[in-house]
Every structure is written in C-alpha cells, then in structure tokens.
Amino acid sequence: MFSSSSRPSKEPLLFDIRLRNLDNDVLLIKGPPDEASSVLLSGTIVLSITEPIQIKSLALRLFGRLRLNIPTVLQTVHGPHKRYSKFERNIYSHFWDDFNIKSYFQNLYDNHNNGKITISSKSSTNLAALPKRKRALSTASLISSNGQTSASKNYHTLVKGNYEFPFSAIIPGSLVESVEGLPNAAVTYALEATIERPKQPDLICKKHLRVIRTLAIDAVELSETVSVDNSWPEKVDYTISIPTKAIAIGSSTMINILIVPILKGLKLGPVRISLVENSQYCGSYGGVINQERMVAKLKLKDPLKHVAQIKKKRSLNEAADEGVDTDTGEFQDKWEVRALLNIPASLTKCSQDCRILSNIKVRHKIKFTISLLNPDGHISELRAALPVQLFISPFVPVNVKTSDVIERTLKTFGPSYQVTSQHDNSFSSKNFVDDSEEDVIFQRSASALQLSSMPTIVSGSTLNINSTDAEATAVADTTMVTSLMVPPNYGNHVYDRVYGEVTNEDETSASASSSAVESQAIHNIQNLYISDSNNSNNPILAPNPQIKIEDDSLNNCDSRGDSVNNSNLNLVNSNLTISENWNNNSPSANRYNNIINAGLNSPSLTPSFAHLSRRNSYSRQTSSTSLKNDLELTDLSRVPSYDKAMKSDMIGEDLPPAYPEEELGVQENKKIELERPQILHHKSTSSLLPLPGSSKSSNNLKRSSSRTHLSHSPLPRNNSGSSVSLQQLARNNTDSSFNLNLSFTSAKSSTGSRHFPFNMTTSFTSNSSSKNNSHFDKTDSTSDANKPREEENYTSATHNRRSRSSSVRSNNSNSPLRQGTGSFANLMEMFTKRDRS
C-alpha cells in the first residue's frame, strides 16, 4: 500500500512517448496542401515505475508553433544597432481525450493488482471482494494513501510495474510543414504528455515531431526541364538548362551550358555557379524582411583550356612582336560545358521551398556568371539565373538538428542587441549550429547506402570536361540521382532484356551450383566501377578512354580480361573473388568478361541497347572506392551506440516467414485421403461379383452393408468388388450354374446383399414372400446332406449360397439353359426372360 510520508516519491524510471511506423519521428506528407491525403499518427505513452505513485490525470496534446526573430535597425548615439524582437504564433493544436485513459485506469487492477494492495475503510469489505460489476460501474478511482477511497480525492494509484497508454489521431494533409533550417525563423511540432500528481510537481514529457512535406510522384516539377535561351548581340548565343526543376536536398543536378560564339577571337573564361536561397518573413507588424545566403557554389576555372592558351601566347610574346594573330587552335562553332552541382545534405545549411501562411516564404535559384575573354583583352561577364525548387525526398538521407539544439536555438529568439556592420546580411550569428550536433533522417531508405557511395565533386573543384571518363561519370551520377526522385518511365519497358538472353550460345552449360553463384557475381560486378580516382596512378585501375566496350565484341572481352582479373575485385554481397589464375579462355571467364564489359558501358541520358537490363529506376552503379570506405569490415563489426541502434535499421529485402521444420514434417506426413462415394445405382453387375471361396470379400460386403444407413456421408469403395471375368466364374462353377452376390445400395433397404441364381426371379425388396422362404428352408436341409463343405472357414452366408445353388440345380436339371452354359448370348437371353417373367 502506498503510504503518504514527508519524503518525495521516486521519479519514474521511464516516461517517454514512442511513435509507431515513423522513421526518426518524421511524419511524411505527400503532395501539396490542397491535394495531400491525411496521415495516421499513432504511438504509446510508456511509463515504468518502481513504487506506487498517485496521479490525477494523464493528458496528451500535439501543438505546432511558428517563431520568428525579427531584426530592427535602430539609430543611436553610438551608431546603428540591430534589435531582435520575438514573434510567436500557434498554428496547430490537437488534444487527446482523457476518457480512454480513465477507462484504462479502471481495468488496471484487474490485470496488475493481484491482491497485493488492500484498502482499509469504515466497512470491512475489501475492494478485491466486491463484485466485478460494481467496480466497473463505480466512477471512483482505486486507492487512497490515507486509507480512504479516492472518490472525493479524484486521483489514481498506480502500483509498481510497466504501463503503456496507446493513442492515435488522423492528421490532415493540409498541415503546415516543419521549417528548421532557416536562421531567425522556425516552425516546430511537439507532443507533450503531462502526468498531474497531487501535492507534487507534474511530470512532463516532450517528443519532437517533424512534419515533412515531399512532392507527389506525379508532380510536374520532377520531370520539367528548366532552361534559359538568350543572346548577347554581336557576341554570343547561349542556352543554360537543368534536367529537372525539382532537386532533392542531398542530391546533385547536372548543369548544361551551350554557348555559340559570334565574335571572332572570343574565348571562354572561368564559369562560376552558385545556388542562392532567398527567404522572406514578417511578423504581425512591420515590413517584410529579406535575407539571402549561399547554399552551394562551384567554380570552373578553365573549362575549355582557353585561359591556358592565352597564357601560352603571352609567354611567347607572339602577338606583341609580330602584331598578327597566330592562333593555331581549332575553330569551335559551339562551346559545351557540363558541370555537376551538389546540394548539401543538411537542413542547417539550406531549407526546402515552402510558404508558411503569410509569415514565411522560401525560394531558390541557380545563378551563373560566365566570363568571356574578348580579343582586345578585356573580360565580359554573362549573368543568368534559373529558378529551382528544393524539396526533401524520403529516398535521400538528410542531416537535421537534434531536438536539444532546436530548443536551445529557439531560446535565443527574443530581445537582444547587436552592432551592425557594412557586411551584415541580416543573419544572426548566434543561430549557427555546429555540424557535430546533427542527426540523420531517412537513413533507413534502401538508397541511403547507394547515395553515400556516389562519387561526388567537392564544391569549388574544377571539372575537366575534356576527360571522357569525368564527363561520363558526371552524367551517370546525375541520371542515377534523378531516377531516385522520378517514378519509372513505363514506356521504356520495350527495352527490357529477358534474363535468359544474357548468356551466349557458344558457351557450354555449367553446373547448377555454379550458375547460382555466377548469377550473383554478375549482378555484383555490374555495380562496380573499374575506374578509381584515388588510384589513377595504377596502370591497371587507371581509366583508359581508348578502350571501347561492346556487348557483341568477343575480342574486347579477351583483351579486357587481364585488367579485370588482375584487379581482384572484391564482391560486396558474395565471397567470390576474380583471381589472376583464372583462365580467360574458359567459358566461365568469357561469360564473366562479357557481363563485366556490358555493365561498364558509360550510361547516357538516352537509353541504348548496349547496357539495357531489368534493373529498376532505383538501382544505380556504385564506385569501388566509396564502397571500400563505407563497407569496411571494422566499421560493420563496430557495435553502435544505443541511440544509433534505435534510430538505424538494417537495409535489406523483406523475406517470407520461416516456419519450423518440425511442423512442416508433421504436415507432410499427414496425407489427406480422398474417398470416392459409392455409386447408388450400378449399371453393371460385373464389378460386384466376388471371387468364390474368398472370405475377405464376404467380410467387406458385410462392412459395406453396415454403412448404408449413413445417407449423407460418402461411402468407401469396396476393394474386394473388383471386376471378375465370366470365364473365371465359369471355371469356378463346375455345374454350369453361376452364383452371383449383388450388392444394391438403396435408401429404402438397410441390406446390401441379394443371393439368387440366374434361372430364378429375384426379389429386390427387403421383404421376401413366405413362400420363397419356405422353399429355401426345404432345399437347405436336403442339399446339406448331399454336398459336403469344401473348407471349414466358410461363413454361414457362403454355406447358404452353396446350399441354395444346389437346390436350384436339383430342381432345374432338365432346363434348356444347361446346354449353353458358357455362352454369353445364352446368359443375356436368360436375364431377359427372367425380367419379363
């Protein structure tokens, strides 16, 4: 019994809110606010206590808040100062009713009390002895600390144990999304559970919830190409384009620049590309505050080597001495530049495009600055911009702030002063967060490992567009990243190759065991790059742009085999290694080389038949260097921390359930025997003729006759009633007379056997005439004295049949049917006459 004392009660060991079916507490909404469907939010409130505690109520609510840190520049005596004012607004709230929790409390002690806690009151009646119906109808709680019922106190006592309180709610699809990456602005959601206790402080548990809105699979932005076409009069015509308007945070986009020079002697200089975020926010009063920040940037110092050519001319002073143009370079009618721009995978460095009510608006655009080197020496700049849309994709892992960092950052919002400078860009420096204090969301997606192993280009690095391998790698990576965001194009299913067509006709058939291993190895080898940027000095692994790989060329397979075999490619998913001792002339080696070369074809933006496969749009190739760094044995064997283990999960395919072998063995041994019901009306009597002298057949006939009263159950077949030829019956019957044992199954009769000779009229009813019965009684007494029994183990039914047959033979010794005993025609004629009579 919980006793009231001056000492404070112990705090619960565990008081937490756990959400179900959510990755890192992320509530994903697909589609725009006016089209998105509702989502289910469910979970449990977990409570673990070591001693009884008293609670009044348990409340749960979900609320969302918008917070702004609005700067205002003030002119003072000491100069301009920037003052920050806090703006806060509740944008969503949902309260769970306590009725379900109270009903849960009423049933707690039926499950957990076990009679350990008693109550003493004026009456000697214990609550445990009360009828169950009375306890259910009572609105009072359970136990009071002072020995009285808690009807007047209105609180509950929870005994030692673990408790789970489930909850669920339907969240509308128009819910405002979370914004955590903007400086001086934030939209956050939280679940708050409160346990109200008498005479003690309340217990409060908060759970940070992220509401992320992503694009629907049919969004136009995922397949819409954005481009700008314009001309600089008497200088250049240019076209700048990107494949899709929507770009996922943490992915990359390919930038295509096409310039047609008009002025003679014009050269291409450095190209600078930057991704700029423009955000606007305002409070209930004042104007709109604009702020910009650089999200990503890329600089191509000399994409076409024009700057190097000019420096070479100046070093030789050819233009200054001779005064003529001695340019021996090839004339180019157009300049093509391709660059891969990486978007940082962090919501602290950029935010998604959004519009939160009338308070926050975020947009992005890519700015281009192209330098043009004129013949007279001065530099002209071509500037352009493309609007893009950044969104959060569930297929790409993204770094986010932890809940502690978010709370710490929001506390800094409010009145503060800061001295402004000329280079101030309206950013509050106190809002920047260390990169080490970040968490990862969507890391359980199957593409997380693939994107982490993608070879990327660091911002600010130079892309050598003249290198064929660098260009092919950039194009391939962009195509692969884009395919993760865009749904598959089902119109291209005509290019699918049947798996059986991969093998060659000339190769010999391998064993079944080796073919399974080879198929797995082929799939793994296709996912590896031979070229390695870190091992470019190695002649084996160095990329060779002169080698052309084709599916139909067997010579290329042979020439490529040495470099592939000597590279000792370690397969990721299998323990197969291609060694140097592998014979290239063997059929297996040729098959491997063919598949390796087919998988290493440089993919392009348009599909070709050289590298078609049945891989879906989410599959992509990975580099061997990244896989080597990401899948080290030491990293895989390292035991993760508890928090990381709770937030991470193994990446793999769902497998069917594995059933115990014992149960399978028992089920296999139990064979279901299906019995065919016995035919009620037999068209032929040959199948019912028993073999003479068979005691087993008579026993079976008795067994079958005893089952005829079960009219609704299927009757088993009589195995002894097999077809017997008339010749065998003739051989067994020496007196040219036949004894037939016909079994007729009828609903009117419980007897299934009738005994009669061929030359007498049968009675198909169960009641025979008294005259026939007396006749058989007389003949039985005479025939038993004249004919001895052949076997001692004959049953009484067999004895009666033989005695009846002998009496009939004695009475019909002069019958004309005896003359044609073995004739089938005479037999049928006898049956016809018998039926007519």
From Swiss-Prot:
Coiled coil: none annotated. The keyword Phosphoprotein applies. Residues 675-726, 763-837 are annotated as: Disordered. One of its GO terms (cellular component) is cytosol. The modification Phosphoserine is found at S138, S141, S436, S536, S720, S725. A motif (PY-motif) lies at residues 487-490, 656-659. InterPro entries: Arrestin-like_C (IPR014752), Arrestin-like_N (IPR011021), Arrestin_C-like (IPR011022), Arrestin_domain-protein (IPR050357). It is a peripheral membrane protein. GO terms for biological process: cellular response to glucose stimulus; positive regulation of receptor internalization; response to xenobiotic stimulus; ubiquitin-dependent endocytosis. It comes from the Eukaryota. The keyword Ubl conjugation applies. Residues 774-792 have a biased composition (Basic and acidic residues). PANTHER family: ARRESTIN DOMAIN CONTAINING PROTEIN, FI21816P1. Belongs to the arrestin family. This is Protein ROD1.
